[in-house]
Structures are given as structure tokens and as C-alpha cells.
Swiss-Prot record:
Function per UniProt: Catalyzes the transfer of the phosphoribosyl group of 5-phosphorylribose-1-pyrophosphate (PRPP) to anthranilate to yield N-(5'-phosphoribosyl)-anthranilate (PRA).
Chain residues that bind Mg(2+) 2: D224, E225
GO cellular component, one term: cytosol
Keyword Metal-binding: yes
Similarity comment: family membership: Belongs to the anthranilate phosphoribosyltransferase family.
Residues the record lists as binding Mg(2+) 1: S91, E225
Taxonomic superkingdom: Bacteria
Cofactor: Mg(2+)
Binding site for anthranilate 1: G79, N110
Cross-referenced NCBIfam families: trpD
Known catalytic reactions: N-(5-phospho-beta-D-ribosyl)anthranilate + diphosphate = 5-phospho-alpha-D-ribose 1-diphosphate + anthranilate
Originating gene: trpD
Cofactor: how bound: Binds 2 magnesium ions per monomer.
Protein name, as recorded: Anthranilate phosphoribosyltransferase
Length: 341
């Protein structure tokens, strides 16, 4: 580890292979906590490259719980968090809209870190069993079309690092890579990030991970979701090409909605918002979900255009299919699934 620390002190970038090896060392129980802390802080101070992010993601996915990965066409629509906006659970609500539109959703998430309610907190409040094993997750993806992967359970080797992150209380590379460490081999992905300057590096990592299509967004006001407040900065990965662009919500018929208007609350309050959206209630929450789910359906290829994606998202809700997926996941995740373990 000393060699890598010296390079970082000198402001040098690590190669992908060096970062992969450093990542394995970070996960080794024999490494000193002071070395982990120094590495994370020095890397952040230098600034992370796409090669470094990918190297660490490789190490984390290698040490994650093993998956059979026989499920084809899975997608995740996870944000990094860290925007401090305290919005309701946009991507988790959108996940059921995607599932209702026929997309297999492997939703990777955690409890609240910078917000009041994380995806795990919301789903637990709604009655979903968040403790599914890899075999159960495969079963749910195949038979329900949506499954939740509780990040701490999927990545047991990260327990020590999470403790050190909490003690450091400063942003590190781990604030950025959550959506990239999903242990399922995803075909497509929709990622929201709070740091605009990391849009391109994250898209490059998704390309290295073999995503067929992906969309990375930094919302207006530096939201880690697509925002109805104004211009959204976007990077699209398609046909192995990366294109940078921007998207205005007014172009798709949405009214401007300030980010403060879509603030959430505790898990009970956010569950009420999610159920309202999935039940077809008209609101700024619904419009925000339609915009995000529409973009995700475009990123997935289920929709050929963003307009078509928004139309499909609205149909998923208004037909009752999105809510049906939630109810199906609640029932199936709480069943005895010993037959698949």
C-alpha cells in the first residue's frame, strides 16, 4: 500500500491495475485503518480518474457475493446520493414504473446516508423484505421482474471501510461508486450523480463494465436525479459511443418545478408519496417520476425516444402495472424461498 500512497502524495494517477490491487488491499482485514483513511483522503484530494474508479469497482465486484448472472437484460436506476437536496425517493419509485413497463430491474441501494430516507428504508416501510440472497434475487428478477439488492449485504467486505468513511465525514470515492458496484451483470443503466464534472468519467466506467446502453445525468441544481427545475446535463452511452448533451424538461411538456417542491421526509412520509404516485395521483412527484422513468426507459432501449419513454412511464402507472409490481415484490420477497437457496 505504501507505494500507492506515495504516488497519491505526489499527485500521480494510479493505473487501472494499480487501483484494482489497491482496492483488494483496502478490503483485506490485515490493512491498518490509518492506511485506509490516508488512501481515501489522498485519492479524493488528487481527484479520481475513470481508470481509478473502474479499478476499484472491479475489486469490489470481485469480492461481492457471487451471482449466477443468468438473468438477461437487467437494468439498475440508482443515484449516487450526496446532493443534500432531501428529495423523496425518486429512483426507487421510478424502479416500479420501469418494472411495470416490462424492464427487469435489479435495484441496488442502501439505507439513508445523506438523506432522511434511503431506498432500503422506503422499501422496508412499504413491506418489502430487503434481505434477499443472490439466489432469491435471481428468482425475483425472473418471476417478479424487480428485486432489491441491499448493498451492505451484497458487499460484506466493505463493513470496515464504511465505518472509516463515517468517521472521516468527508466525501470519498465511495460517494460516487455505489451505482457502479451492482453485482448483477446489467445490460443497461440509468445513473444520477451529484458531481457534474464526473459525468464523463462515470459514463466511461459504464462503458468498461460492458453496458450496452446507459444514461448518466446531473440534474439542475446538482441533483443526483433528472430535475424539472431546469437544464439537466447528460451523457449518453449507446453503440459504444459516448455523447454529451443537455435536456430541458419544458421540451417534454413539463412545468418548471423547484427542487424544494419535491422534498421528502421520513420513511412513512416518503412511502405515502410513492404510493400516491404509483396509484396515479397527479402531482409534482408524479411528473418528476415520469421524467426520470422516461429517461431510464430511453436509456434501456425499451423506448426509442425520450418522449416515448415518458408515454410508456405514464401507461405503466395509469394501467396499474407499476403498483402491481410493488405488491408482487412485497408478497414474493416475504415468501419462503428455500427452494431457490
Amino acid at each position: 500500500m505504501n507505494n500507492y500512497l506515495r504516488k497519491l502524495v505526489e499527485g500521480q494517477h494510479l493505473t487501472e491495475e494499480e487501483m484494482y490491487k489497491a482496492g483488494l488491499l483496502l478490503l483485506n482485514e490485515n490493512i491498518l485503518e490509518s492506511e485506509i483513511a490516508a488512501f481515501l483522503v489522498l485519492l479524493k484530494a488528487k481527484g479520481e480518474t475513470a481508470e481509478e474508479i473502474y479499478g476499484l469497482v472491479r475489486a469490489l465486484r470481485e469480492k461481492a457475493l457471487p451471482f449466477s448472472n443468468h438473468i438477461q437484460g437487467a437494468m439498475d436506476n440508482c443515484g449516487t446520493g450526496g446532493d443534500g437536496a432531501q428529495t423523496f425517493n425518486i429512483s426507487t419509485t421510478s424502479a416500479f414504473v420501469l418494472a411495470g413497463a416490462g424492464v427487469k430491474v435489479a435495484k441496488h441501494g442502501n439505507r439513508a446516508v445523506s438523506s432522511k430516507t434511503g431506498s432500503a428504508d422506503l422499501l422496508e416501510e412499504l413491506g418489502v423484505n430487503i434481505s434477499s440472497t443472490p439466489n432469491e434475487i435471481d428468482y425475483l428478477l425472473e418471476h417478479v421482474g424487480i428485486a432489491f439488492l441491499f448493498a451492505p449485504a451484497m458487499h460484506p467486505a466493505l463493513k470496515r471501510i464504511m465505518k472509516i468513511r463515517k468517521e472521516l465525514n468527508v466525501p470519498t470515492i465511495f460517494n460516487l461508486i455505489g451505482p457502479l458496484t451492482n453485482p448483477v451483470n446489467l445490460e443497461t443503466q440509468f445513473v444520477g450523480i451529484y458531481k457534474r464534472d464526473m459525468l464523463l468519467p462515470v459514463a466511461q466506467v459504464l462503458q468498461k463494465l460492458g453496458r450496452k446502453q446507459a444514461l448518466v445525468v446531473n440534474g439542475s441544481g446538482f441533483l443526483d436525479e433528472a430535475s424539472l427545475q431546469g437544464e439537466n446535463h447528460v451523457v449518453i452511452l449507446k453503440d459504444n459511443e459516448i455523447v454529451e448533451t443537455s435536456i430541458e424538461p419544458e421540451k417534454y411538456g413539463f412545468s418548471i418545478v423547484k427542487n424544494e417542491e419535491i422534498r421528502g421526509g421520513n420513511s412513512k412520509e416518503n412511502a405515502k408519496i410513492t404510493l400516491g404516485v404509483l396509484s396515479g395521483e397527479k402531482s409534482v412527484y408524479r411528473d418528476t417520476v415520469l421524467f426520470n422513468a422516461g429517461l431510464a426507459l430511453f436509456a434501456n432501449g425499451k423506448a426509442k425516444t425520450i418522449e416515448e419513454g415518458i408515454t410508456l412511464a405514464a401507461h405503466s402507472i395509469d394501467s396499474g402495472k407499476a403498483l402491481a409490481k410493488l405488491n408482487l415484490l412485497i408478497a414474493a420477497s416475504n415468501e419462503e424461498l428455500e427452494r431457490v437457496n
